[in-house]
Swiss-Prot record:
Keywords: Cell inner membrane, Cell membrane, Membrane, Transmembrane, Transmembrane helix, Virulence
Gene3D superfamilies given in the database record: 3.30.70.260
Function of the protein: Virulence factor required for growth in low Mg(2+) medium and for intramacrophage survival. May be involved in regulating membrane potential by activating Na(+)/K(+)-ATPase.
Protein known as: Protein MgtC
Source species: Salmonella typhi
Domain of life where this protein originates: Bacteria
Principal location listed in the UniProt entry: membrane
Membrane-crossing segments per the record: 5-25, 39-59, 62-82, 103-123
Protein family (similarity comment): Belongs to the MgtC/SapB family.
N-terminal signal peptide: none
A GO term from the CC aspect: plasma membrane
Membrane disposition: Multi-pass membrane protein
Keyword Cell membrane: yes
InterPro entries: MgtC-like_C, MgtC/SapB/SrpB/YhiD_fam, MgtC_SapB_SrpB_YhiD_N
Amino acid sequence: MEERMLMFPYILNLLAAMLLGALIGAERQWRQRMAGLRTNALVATGAAVFILSSMTTSPDSPGRIAAQIVSGIGFLGAGVIMREGMNVRGLNTAATLWCSAGIGVLCGLGQFKNALAATIIILCANILLREAAQRINQLPVSAEAEKRYILKVTCNKEDESAVRQWLLNIVKEAAICLQGLGSVPAQEQGYKEIRAELVGHADYRKTRELIISRIGDNDNITAIHWSIDSQ
C-alpha cells in the first residue's frame, strides 16, 4: 500500500506532462506539421521522466538535468528543421518541441499550475501570433526591407567559370549579398544553369535593371531568369 502511495505522485506528474504535451502537439497535428501530437507528448513525458529520476537519485540535481534536457532537445529540434535553397522550414516546430520539454520539466517538478499556464501561453503563441504574422506579411513592404531573389543564368559548359566570375562582379557592383552560388546541368545538352541566391533591398528594380543592362556585355550567356523568392 505504501509503495502504491509513493507511485501515485510519480504517475500523476507523468500523466500531466503527457496531457499538456499532447495539448500542444494537437495544434501542430492540426496544422499537419512533422512533430505533432505524439511527438510533443513524448518529449514532455521524457523530460518529466528525467527530472523525476534525478530527484529520486539526487534531490539537488534537477537544475543540472534540466540543462541537459535543453541540450538534448536541441539535437531533436535540428531533425525537424529543413533548408530548401534559401528557405528554412520547421523552426516553429522545433521551438514548440523545446517548449514541450519545458512543460515536462515543470510537471516533473510538480509545478502543475505553472505548467498549465505555460501551455496556454505556448498555444496562444502558435495560434494567435500566427494570424498576427500573416496580417503583418500582407502590409506593404518597406523599401528598406530585405528581399530574397533567385537569379538563374544558362551558358555553355565551357564558359561556366567565366560566367560565375561575371556574376560575382555583378553582385559586387549592385551591392547585394550573395547567399549561395551553384550550378546544375541545363535541359539542353552541353549547357549549364548557374543559380545565384541573392539578398537585397525590397526595391529591386535598380538591381534588376543593372543585371539586364549587363547581359549584353557577356556573349557567353544564352538565357537568364530573375525571380523573387516567395518564401
